C-alpha cells in the first residue's frame, strides 16, 4: 500500500501544479486514510495470536455497541415507541435505528465473527465467539444500511452452501479492478445526470448527486486527492468517484488492483472486499478507519496461514448442500488456512 500512497501523492502534486495551487494538507490526511488502516492491521496480525485478535474484536464489538446507544435517537424510549417502528421504510432507507457512525464497524465485525464462530483452538472460547456473531448480525441489521443488510442475508444463506476456504482464480484481481474502474466511470456519469436523463437521481442516491453538484459549480477543479472537501466545504461521500475525479482513472485502477491483490484468491476475502468496493462506489467508508482495520484483519487472517500455524481449526456447519461443494477429510469436515497474505 505504500507505493499506492506514493502514487496518489505524485498525482496530487501534478493536479495541484496544473491548477497553479499548492498541495493541500487535506491530501496527506486523505492518503493516510488509505494507507494506515492496512499497515495497522498487518501490525496487529503479526503481533497478536489469533485468540488475542478474537478477544480484541469482542472488546471492539462491546465498545461499538456503547457508541451506538450514545447516538441521538437510540435511547430506550425510542426503541419502545411503536410509532418509530411504524415509520421504518426499506425503500426510502428510513429508520430510527439507522447509524452512519457504527454501521461499517458492525458489518465488518459480523464478517469477522461469521468466519470464526466455529473456530477451535487453544484459548479460544467458542461460545463467546458465537454470541458475538449473533450480536453483530443483529446490530448490522439495526444500522439499516441496505447494502450491508443485503450482504448479511447473502452471507448467512451462502454459509450453508459455500466453503469459505475455497479458492478463486488469480485472474479475478485484474478482472475486479477493471470492473470497478468501469463501474465508477459509469456511476460518475449517472450521478452527473448524463447517463439517464429524467431519472430521479436525488432520491436514488439519497442526495449524493447534490453534493457532487456543489463541485460542478466550480467546474470540478482539483488540487489533488481530498481537495474537493476543502473546495465544497463537505465530504463528497463517494470514495471511488472521488479518486477518479480528483486524480485520474489510472489512480482508480491502481487502488482497486492493490486492494483486491490484498484480498488474494480466498472466497471469503474476495466477498468481503467486494462489499467494501460496492460501498465505496455508492457511499463512503474510507474515513471510517476502525471499520477498515477490522476488515483488513479479517481478510489477512482468513487468507493467510496464521490459523494453521497456531493450530486453530474452523469446523464448518454441516449441510447437505455444502457436501456437494466441499471435500471430506478423514470423515471429519475440518478446513485449514493455506493461502499466503499478499502485502503490497
Give residue ranges: language-model regions:
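Hydrophobic transmembrane helix bundles of membrane-integrated enzymes that assemble
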Residues: 1-196, 200, 213-220, 235-325, ...
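Internal helical hairpin/lid segments
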Residues: 207-212
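Residue-identity detector for glycine
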Residues: 330-331
Amino acid at each position: 500500500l505504500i507505493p499506492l500512497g506514493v502514487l496518489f501523492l505524485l498525482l496530487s502534486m501534478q493536479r495541484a501544479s496544473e491548477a497553479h495551487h499548492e498541495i493541500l494538507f487535506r491530501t496527506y490526511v486523505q492518503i493516510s486514510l488509505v494507507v494506515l488502516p492496512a499497515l495497522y492491521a498487518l501490525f496487529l496480525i503479526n503481533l497478536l495470536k489469533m485468540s488475542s485478535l478474537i478477544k480484541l474484536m469482542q472488546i471492539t464489538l462491546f465498545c461499538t455497541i456503547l457508541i451506538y446507544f450514545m447516538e441521538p435517537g437510540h435511547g430506550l424510549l425510542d426503541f419502545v415507541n411503536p410509532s418509530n417502528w411504524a415509520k421504518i421504510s426499506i425503500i426510502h432507507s428510513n429508520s430510527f435505528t439507522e447509524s452512519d457512525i457504527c454501521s461499517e464497524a458492525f458489518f465488518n465485525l459480523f464478517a469477522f465473527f461469521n468466519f470464526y464462530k466455529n473456530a477451535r483452538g487453544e484459548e479460544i472460547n467458542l461460545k463467546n465467539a458465537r454470541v458475538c456473531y449473533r450480536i453483530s448480525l443483529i446490530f448490522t441489521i439495526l444500522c439499516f444500511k441496505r447494502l450491508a443488510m443485503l450482504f448479511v442475508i447473502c452471507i448467512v444463506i451462502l454459509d450453508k452452501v459455500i466453503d469459505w476456504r475455497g479458492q478463486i482464480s488469480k485472474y479475478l484481481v485484474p478482472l475486479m479492478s477493471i470492473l470497478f474502474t468501469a463501474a465508477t466511470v459509469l456511476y460518475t456519469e449517472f450521478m452527473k445526470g448524463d447517463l439517464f436523463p429524467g431519472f430521479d437521481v436525488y432520491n436514488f442516491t439519497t442526495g449524493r448527486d447534490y453534493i457532487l453538484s456543489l463541485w460542478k459549480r466550480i467546474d470540478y477543479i482539483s488540487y489533488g486527492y481530498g481537495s474537493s472537501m476543502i473546495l465544497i466545504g463537505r465530504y463528497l461521500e463517494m470514495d471511488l468517484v472521488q479518486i477518479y475525479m480528483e486524480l485520474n482513472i489510472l489512480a482508480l485502477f491502481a487502488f482497486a488492483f492493490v486492494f483486491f491483490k490484498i484480498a488474494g484468491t480466498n472466497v471469503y476475502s474476495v466477498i468481503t472486499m467486494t462489499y467494501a468496493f460496492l460501498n465505496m462506489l455508492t457511499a463512503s467508508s474510507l474515513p471510517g478507519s476502525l471499520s477498515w482495520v477490522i476488515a483488513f484483519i479479517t481478510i489477512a487472517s482468513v487468507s493467510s496461514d496464521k490459523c494453521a500455524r497456531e493450530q486453530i481449526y474452523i469446523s464448518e456447519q454441516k449441510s447437505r448442500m455444502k457436501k456437494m461443494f466441499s471435500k471430506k477429510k478423514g470423515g471429519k469436515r475440518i478446513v485449514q488456512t493455506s493461502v499466503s497474505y499478499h502485502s503490497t
